[in-house]
Amino acid sequence: MTLKELRLAAGFQQAEVAKKLGVTTTAVSNWELGKNAILRKYHKKLAKLYGVTVEELIGTMPQG
């Protein structure tokens, strides 16, 4: 699954994820588009939010 698919499967809009993590909606969008890497400090929070392991989350990140 992609980051976007994980987010949608968890039932969140980008704005909701951004608010829960304390980042901008643009940051979440850029993560999903592979424009920016997710900072390590958000890995655990985002994985928990999406109901996956950190390893599964990292596996969805585009390789640039």
What are these regions (language model features)?
Residues 3, 17-18, 28-31, 57:
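Conserved hydrophobic/aromatic packing and binding residues within compact polymer-binding modules
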Residues 56-64:
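Short amphipathic recognition helices of helix-turn-helix/homeodomain-type DNA-binding modules
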Residues 2-20, 45:
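Short basic helix-loop element that most often maps to the first helix and adjoining turn
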Residues 41-56:
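DNA major-groove recognition helix of helix-turn-helix/homeodomain DNA-binding modules
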Residues 23-38:
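Recognition helix of helix-turn-helix/homeodomain-like DNA-binding domains
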